[in-house]
Amino acid sequence: MKQKLLELILTHAYRYSEQPFTLASGKKSRHYFNCKEITLVPDRLELLCKFIVERHLDESGILKPQAFGGLTMGADPICYGISLEFRKQDKNIYPLIVRKFSKDHGTNKLVEGAVHEVKSCVIVDDVITTGGSTIQAIRSMRDSGIVVVQGICILDRQEGGMDAILAEGVQMFPIFKKSDFGNLEHE
């Protein structure tokens, strides 16, 4: 299953360009991983979430909390998919979504979902570079009274993000590291 995910990422999510891409962190890179090509395609998302629930959580020693949540939009489909995989086991594990900015109407909440049902959460992200988006989500969860126990991501670009998140007190467990892809073409 993990090998199939790696192949899907290389085939559908990985891009190389002589003209560097601007990453969410603001950094520039010729190597771009658009994991939404995995998470927004139903059969690929299903495989990813099935792998996370059936293998990655146990292999990494990740605690099974009451929720999985992260910053919109990278985490959204992953959190929903994980929740649905747990429903197949008759377990309610809630998806939580962290807004980038609070709304100026309604409840003005940054964290959406069954927050009143949740005391602990595994933070989720698709790709980690500097860790800035994940740290924003962790802080918003904590401000909402939720304990972030650990984290998962599809890909660690190995550019310091894991250390920055660990400095926030959260250990991340990536499914893949950039180095897992070997010598990427055009290195």
Swiss-Prot record:
<keyword id="KW-0460">Magnesium</keyword>
<feature type="binding site">
    <location>
        <position position="105"/>
    </location>
    <ligand>
        <name>5-phospho-alpha-D-ribose 1-diphosphate</name>
    </ligand>
</feature>
<feature type="binding site" description="in other chain">
    <location>
        <begin position="125"/>
        <end position="133"/>
    </location>
    <ligand>
        <name>5-phospho-alpha-D-ribose 1-diphosphate</name>
    </ligand>
</feature>
<feature type="binding site">
    <location>
        <position position="129"/>
    </location>
    <ligand>
        <name>orotate</name>
    </ligand>
</feature>
<feature type="binding site">
    <location>
        <position position="99"/>
    </location>
    <ligand>
        <name>5-phospho-alpha-D-ribose 1-diphosphate</name>
    </ligand>
</feature>
<dbReference type="GO" id="GO:0000287">
    <property type="term" value="F:magnesium ion binding"/>
</dbReference>
<feature type="binding site" description="in other chain">
    <location>
        <position position="100"/>
    </location>
    <ligand>
        <name>5-phospho-alpha-D-ribose 1-diphosphate</name>
    </ligand>
</feature>
<dbReference type="InterPro" id="IPR000836">
    <property type="entry name" value="PRibTrfase_dom"/>
</dbReference>
<dbReference type="InterPro" id="IPR004467">
    <property type="entry name" value="Or_phspho_trans_dom"/>
</dbReference>
<keyword id="KW-0665">Pyrimidine biosynthesis</keyword>
<dbReference type="InterPro" id="IPR029057">
    <property type="entry name" value="PRTase-like"/>
</dbReference>
<comment type="pathway">
    <text>Pyrimidine metabolism; UMP biosynthesis via de novo pathway; UMP from orotate: step 1/2.</text>
</comment>
<feature type="binding site">
    <location>
        <position position="157"/>
    </location>
    <ligand>
        <name>orotate</name>
    </ligand>
</feature>
<comment type="similarity">
    <text>Belongs to the purine/pyrimidine phosphoribosyltransferase family. PyrE subfamily.</text>
</comment>
<dbReference type="GO" id="GO:0004588">
    <property type="term" value="F:orotate phosphoribosyltransferase activity"/>
</dbReference>
<comment type="function">
    <text>Catalyzes the transfer of a ribosyl phosphate group from 5-phosphoribose 1-diphosphate to orotate, leading to the formation of orotidine monophosphate (OMP).</text>
</comment>
<comment type="subunit">
    <text>Homodimer.</text>
</comment>
<keyword id="KW-0808">Transferase</keyword>
<keyword id="KW-0328">Glycosyltransferase</keyword>
<feature type="binding site">
    <location>
        <position position="103"/>
    </location>
    <ligand>
        <name>5-phospho-alpha-D-ribose 1-diphosphate</name>
    </ligand>
</feature>
<dbReference type="Pfam" id="PF00156">
    <property type="entry name" value="Pribosyltran"/>
</dbReference>
<dbReference type="GO" id="GO:0044205">
    <property type="term" value="P:'de novo' UMP biosynthetic process"/>
</dbReference>
<dbReference type="GO" id="GO:0019856">
    <property type="term" value="P:pyrimidine nucleobase biosynthetic process"/>
</dbReference>
<dbReference type="InterPro" id="IPR023031">
    <property type="entry name" value="OPRT"/>
</dbReference>
<protein>
    <recommendedName>
        <fullName>Orotate phosphoribosyltransferase</fullName>
        <ecNumber>2.4.2.10</ecNumber>
    </recommendedName>
</protein>
